Amino acid sequence: MTDKDKDLHCSFCGKEKGEVDRLIAGTDGYICNECIELCHSMLEESHDKNLEESAVENEEKLPTPHEIRAHLDDYVIGQDYAKKVLSVAVYNHYKRLRTNYESNDVELGKSNILLIGPTGSGKTLLAQTLARRLNVPFAMADATTLTEAGYVGEDVENVLQKLLQNCEYDTEKAEKGIIYIDEIDKISRKSEGASITRDVSGEGVQQALLKLIEGTIASIPPQGGRKHPQQEMVKLDTSKILFICGGAFAGLDKIIDKRTQTSTSIGFNAKVEKDEKQQSLSELFRQVEPDDLMKFGLIPEFIGRLPMIAPLSELDEDALIQILTKPKNALIKQYQALFGLEKVELDFTPEALKAMAKKALERKTGARGLRSIVEAVLLDTMYDLPSLENLQKVIVDESTIVDNLAPKLEY
């Protein structure tokens, strides 16, 4: 080492050129490779700290149960009790995730939710609206298409596959997502006793879903399809995913009614006297207990993984009319906007709205059937609309719905 080399040293740590791997010259001094690495690690730590602080700021934006409920009110008519249950359950779930709560004494469980209500009462819409408000990935599956692994049909883990696809395989995002499983009542076991034959689409699916809903590290094929040994898997922690299951549970009301009805019998031939006032479906569903769900065909372990039960009520005529007109994305508003693109005003009379609601009730399709009714009423008009010059207004009245007459056109 020359005397000149001895004079060269790091301006930060003082080490000479021979003591380090590299010495880089600046305008008025030198810096060694070790100090560069130290500065780099300090910058990384600072960057990570800024990211953590930014994450904390975002965590503070978690909407309160009141705010969640208010957002649901903008898009879903009625179902006040179900909205309250959902708002509290969702808030508690994401509060648990965002605070990373840890305690040796208390373990916070997952607030998975079971929605019970008739077809077209808003179960799917509630789940979708929640995910949109919280800005988290959302995936939906139909329980009737699911089977146990190894059988023909969709594996239960395909539900996780859909969630990953919806957030471009970002596992961190997916683990904060919401999965809605519809028609969950259709996977009830076929009988209360143990089955000799394998029930691959009933109790078998319930067993397969148990681990996912409770929380497990699932291995998901990155491009879908069946697993094979050579394929690299994506690991997903399902303990952070909120599962919402929904179903109509036709017949559950009879099970609840049988348990809750008061009856008196005196003598050998006495008749059972029921309450004079017949309870509504929603009133019965509000009284549901785990034993009722077990008798319906859900296994105890599965019921235990869905601690929050939110019953939905049947929609009456007034509720259906409100669904047509009140929400931010109400059907009538959507079609009025569509006609507006053609510079044409679309108007529905109050009698027409009432007739459409009545028709949906007769079909027993709830809110779900309203779109098909409106679509059928306006089909011919929408077909001709671009060709009708100088058309100013289209009026749909009661005769259009009841007598299948064409809407009135004003030029």
Curated annotation (Swiss-Prot):
SMART domains registered for this protein in UniProt: AAA, ClpB_D2-small, zf-C4_ClpX
GO cellular component: HslUV protease complex
Function as written in the Swiss-Prot or TrEMBL entry: ATP-dependent specificity component of the Clp protease. It directs the protease to specific substrates. Can perform chaperone functions in the absence of ClpP.
Annotated InterPro entries: AAA+_ATPase, ATP-dep_Clp_protease_ClpX, ATPase_AAA_core, Clp_ATPase_C, Clp_protease_ATP-bd_su_ClpX, ClpX_bact, P-loop_NTPase, Znf_CppX_C4
Name this polypeptide is given: ATP-dependent Clp protease ATP-binding subunit ClpX
Domain ClpX-type ZB: start-end pairs: 1-51
Complex formation: Component of the ClpX-ClpP complex. Forms a hexameric ring that, in the presence of ATP, binds to fourteen ClpP subunits assembled into a disk-like structure with a central cavity, resembling the structure of eukaryotic proteasomes.
Binding site for Zn(2+): 10, 13, 32, 35
Alphabetized PROSITE patterns for the sequence: CLPX_ZB
GO MF annotations in UniProt: ATP binding; ATP hydrolysis activity; ATP-dependent protein folding chaperone; protein dimerization activity; unfolded protein binding; zinc ion binding
Species for this entry: Haemophilus influenzae (strain ATCC 51907 / DSM 11121 / KW20 / Rd)
Gene of this entry: clpX
SUPFAM superfamilies: Glucocorticoid receptor-like (DNA-binding domain), P-loop containing nucleoside triphosphate hydrolases
Pfam families, per the entry: AAA_2, ClpB_D2-small, zf-C4_ClpX
Family per record: Belongs to the ClpX chaperone family.
Keywords recorded for this protein, A-Z: ATP-binding, Chaperone, Metal-binding, Nucleotide-binding, Zinc
Positions that bind ATP: 118-125
GO biological process: cell division; proteolysis involved in protein catabolic process
